[in-house]
Swiss-Prot record:
This is Uncharacterized HTH-type transcriptional regulator Rv0023. Keywords: DNA-binding, Transcription, Transcription regulation. PROSITE patterns: HTH_CROC1 (PS50943). The keyword Transmembrane helix does not apply. CDD domains: HTH_XRE. Gene3D superfamilies: lambda repressor-like DNA-binding domains (1.10.260.40). InterPro entries: Cro/C1-type_HTH, Lambda_DNA-bd_dom_sf. Residues 10-64 form the HTH cro/C1-type domain.
């Protein structure tokens, strides 16, 4: 009934999958130091950290909170995992990431697929749309998608350089992750980040041109599209761009 016990249960689950802290950090976007603090119960973890760890491990939302109050965190974690819908592919592939090291590219492909399976599993257990935490969880899963996309892109580059035959499958995983990211944004259709993401796709303009229009860099563009983090000075231009593209798109549809 403490952070130490809850963290120990999380660590045991990680180790049972033969994941290092670095593996979990790559899967969650949380620093290894932050994960170490959580597993040791050294500090009270931030809510977003807990959500990322739950998502990365494919655990139901609220798992960590349940472990904090459980008389036997290990037994409670086992119960929660057993209660999840069976997904043997995800479990097998997640284990394969570290254990079945036939080649570097096989590991990278397995890891990309495990990430996609884990994200889909989390989406299946999202809170109700009426929940106060619904948008927070959506943004958390989008962040996981973005992280997984960047890893898959790097994996594809490694596979190409190695002349591996997994490049096609990695590209399929990357496209699936991007489709998932877009679908998650569609769950918040009125948010400015979702509207901006749609506008970027509908405009047919190169990203560099859109960035020049609103006066931000490429990294800031990505943050706006996924996290809604908009520099104060760019906010009027972002809104103007979105309004212009939406009006043009609506006019085009009206003529069809």
């Amino acid at each position: 009934m403490s952070r130490e016990s809850a963290g120990a249960a999380i660590r045991a689950l990680r180790e049972s999958r033969d994941w290092s802290l670095a593996d979990l950090a790559a899967a969650t976007g949380v620093s290894t130091m932050g994960l170490s603090y959580l597993e040791r119960g050294a500090r009270k973890p931030h809510k977003s950290t807990v959500q990322k760890v739950e998502n990365g491990l494919g655990l139901p939302p609220g798992t960590y909170s349940r472990l904090l109050v459980a008389a036997d965190p290990d037994a409670e974690l086992a119960r929660l995992i057993a209660a999840q819908p069976s997904n043997p592919t995800a479990v097998r592939r997640a284990g394969a990431v570290v254990v079945d090291r036939h080649s570097d590219t096989d590991v990278l492909e397995g890891y990309a697929e495990a990430q996609l399976d884990a994200i889909k599993s989390v989406i299946d257990r999202l809170p109700a749309t009426t929940s106060n935490e619904y948008e927070t969880y959506i943004l958390s899963v989008i962040a996981q998608c973005v992280k997984a996309e960047m890893l898959a892109a790097s994996s594809w580059r490694v596979a190409v350089n190695a002349g591996a035959d997994s490049t096609g499958r990695l590209m399929e995983h990357l496209r699936a992750l991007e489709a998932t990211r877009g679908a998650l944004l569609e769950r918040m259709p009125t948010s400015l980040s979702a509207r901006f993401d749609r506008a970027c796709a509908q405009s047919s303009l190169p990203e560099a041109v859109v960035a020049a229009l609103i006066g931000v860099g490429a990294d800031e563009m990505w943050d706006i599209r996924n996290r809604g983090v908009i520099p104060a000075g760019a906010l009027p231009r972002v809104r103007a761009f979105v309004d212009a593209i939406e009006a043009s798109h609506d006019a085009d549809e009206g003529q069809q």
